[in-house]
């Protein structure tokens, strides 16, 4: 969303071959960029003008910080001499962005190349995240200079010595190993090494919501996702407590509910933590902490350790029982309601459909029910857990992968936060499908309110015609009240040459006992 202070910057980006896309709000622009990032792996570039433009982007930048998304945030600002006497829209933007970024720099014309290279490096190394560059008008207008910066990439490290020997011994001796796989695996070339490691040693695994699909969820060792569902945790956490070896592989507990605090006990269980950054969260502890390359570490652990025969671990077959219990807890055969909506989408849409999910009760249910076949198939805000992200994420994903079916899942409140971007989808000529759970309520908060026996306050609102909104912005719109109507709407949407809003009318309280 440009302003006068970033016009030169926008022009320079286009001339450098970086396509600039106009959104209706800076927050949504950042989430569109994240949707593209999950396709090509490149950092998001978010451009905002000074003052209100920069501040409109605070939410998505905080999300990038907590959800580990590489992002370079370029904000316009007036020059220091000008700011000494000119105050209109002027504030200390670096002070605003510093707490929610990995770094914030004021761009200087004499060091612009160095600072820009630093920004990309910091955003993409270690645990990914946002970096802010405040760009004064005179610096943006200054001619660029070529400077060859010879920067060697960070080396891949692996454990060695006594630590490695101890970890191998635990792996060889474990009768009930369990792996917890988290979002750090997405930023390393981990899929093949992880699969080989888990299969070689017959280790059942749970993923966080963001790591779903790092191995196909129909894999016999996969127990599905974990994060925010007390219902799922009733089955998963006893298995965690019963394990004799916990392997935390790229696991970042920022995605998890408090029930996962100290979910294992290093005093009676062997716990090995392989991670991108040191453990400063104290959500859990381990006997051995390895800040190292995940693929290199898994290879080092396996070297000299004998493979396990199938079913050589967990002689009591408890993981299989847990997997069956989870399938029963989140059934696919409900006639209607939130679970029925998700089940019908699973039955009708292609197996490789790309999904985005807004925060709310529906996201928890979707993350537990949907079986992902590839990494990043289901994208969501699971660290900051912000609303209003699914619709723009889907626009970005469709922009990057126009030949794939792309579907967003939003509650009605979250959809309303981003509904203006329907215009962007129309202007870009994109045809994602926007599924809306319409119950006229902040369903998750209303459920918590009732559980605390508090009066119904500020959680319910009027029902709106979301299908008409889709049509008003040049797309298609369908209002559906059962699985047959939903199936027909999805089928039509997949054949359409423009976007489609599918408004699924469900009853309030439909998530009770479901999440």
Could you describe each region identified by the protein language model?
Residues 2, 75, 137, 209, ...:
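Short, small-residue-rich loop/turn micro-motifs
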Residues 1, 6-12, 220, 317-392, ...:
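Active-site diphosphate/adenylate-binding microenvironment
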Residues 82-89, 228, 242, 281-282, ...:
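Thiamine diphosphate
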Residues 179, 246, 355, 406, ...:
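Receiver (REC) domain switch-region micro-motif
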Residues 133, 249, 274-275, 357, ...:
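Active-site flanking residues adjacent to catalytic metal/cofactor-binding acidic residues
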Residues 1-306, 348-351, 431-434, 454-455, ...:
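N-terminal alpha/beta PP-like core and its mobile active-site loop of ThDP/TPP-dependent enzymes
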Residues 107, 146-148, 165, 169, ...:
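Phosphate/pyrophosphate-binding active-site segments
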Residues 178-182, 354-358, 412:
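Short hydrophobic beta-strand segments
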């Amino acid at each position: 969303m440009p302003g006068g202070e970033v016009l030169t910057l926008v022009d320079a980006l286009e001339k450098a071959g970086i396509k600039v896309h106009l959104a209706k709000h800076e927050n949504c622009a950042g989430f569109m960029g994240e949707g593209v990032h999950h396709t090509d792996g490149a950092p998001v570039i978010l451009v905002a003008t000074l003052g209100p433009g920069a501040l409109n982007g605070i939410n998505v930048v905080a999300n990038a910080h907590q959800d580990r998304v590489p992002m370079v945030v370029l904000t316009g600002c007036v020059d220091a001499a000008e700011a000494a006497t000119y105050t209109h829209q002027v504030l200390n933007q670096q002070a605003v962005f510093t707490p929610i970024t990995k770094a914030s720099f004021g761009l200087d014309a004499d060091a612009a190349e160095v600072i820009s290279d630093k920004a990309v490096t910091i955003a993409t190394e270690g645990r990914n995240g946002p970096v802010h560059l405040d760009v004064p008008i005179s610096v943006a207008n200054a001619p660029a200079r070529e400077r060859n910066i010879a920067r060697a990439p960070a080396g891949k490290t692996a454990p060695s010595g006594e630590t490695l020997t101890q970890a191998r011994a635990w792996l060889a001796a474990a009768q009930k190993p369990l792996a917890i796989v988290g979002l750090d695996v997405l930023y390393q070339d981990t899929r093949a090494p992880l699969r080989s490691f888990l299969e070689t040693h017959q280790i059942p695994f749970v993923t966080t919501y963001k790591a779903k699909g790092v191995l196909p969820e129909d894999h016999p060792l996969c127990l599905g996702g974990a994060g925010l569902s007390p219902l799922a945790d009733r089955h998963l956490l006893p298995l965690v407590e019963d394990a004799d070896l916990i392997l935390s592989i790229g696991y970042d507990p920022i995605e998890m509910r408090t029930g996962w605090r100290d979910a294992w006990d290093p005093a009676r269980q062997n716990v090995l933590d392989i991670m991108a950054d040191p453990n400063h969260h104290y959500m859990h502890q381990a006997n051995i902490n390895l800040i190292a390359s995940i693929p290199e570490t898994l290879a080092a652990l396996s070297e000299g350790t004998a493979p396990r025969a199938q079913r050589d671990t967990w002689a009591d077959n408890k993981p299989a029982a847990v997997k069956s219990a989870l399938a029963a807890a989140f059934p696919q055969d409900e006639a209607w309601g939130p679970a029925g909506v998700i089940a019908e989408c699973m039955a009708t849409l292609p197996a490789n459909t790309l999904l985005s999910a807004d925060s709310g009760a529906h996201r928890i249910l979707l993350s537990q029910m949907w079986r992902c076949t590839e990494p990043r198939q289901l994208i969501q805000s699971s660290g900051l857990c912000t609303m209003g992200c699914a619709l723009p994420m889907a626009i970005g994903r469709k922009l990057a992968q126009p030949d794939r079916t792309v579907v967003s899942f939003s509650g009605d409140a979250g959809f309303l936060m981003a509904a203006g971007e329907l215009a962007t989808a129309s202007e870009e000529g994109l045809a994602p499908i926007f599924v809306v759970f319409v119950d006229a309520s902040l369903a998750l908060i209303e459920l918590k309110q009732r559980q605390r026996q508090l009066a119904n306050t500020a959680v319910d609102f009027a029902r709106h015609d979301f299908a008409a909104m889709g049509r008003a912005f040049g797309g298609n719109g369908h209002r559906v009240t059962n699985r047959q109507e939903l199936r027909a709407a999805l089928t039509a949407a997949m054949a359409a040459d423009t976007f489609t809003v599918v408004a699924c009318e469900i009853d309030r309280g439909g998530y009770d006992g479901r999440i």
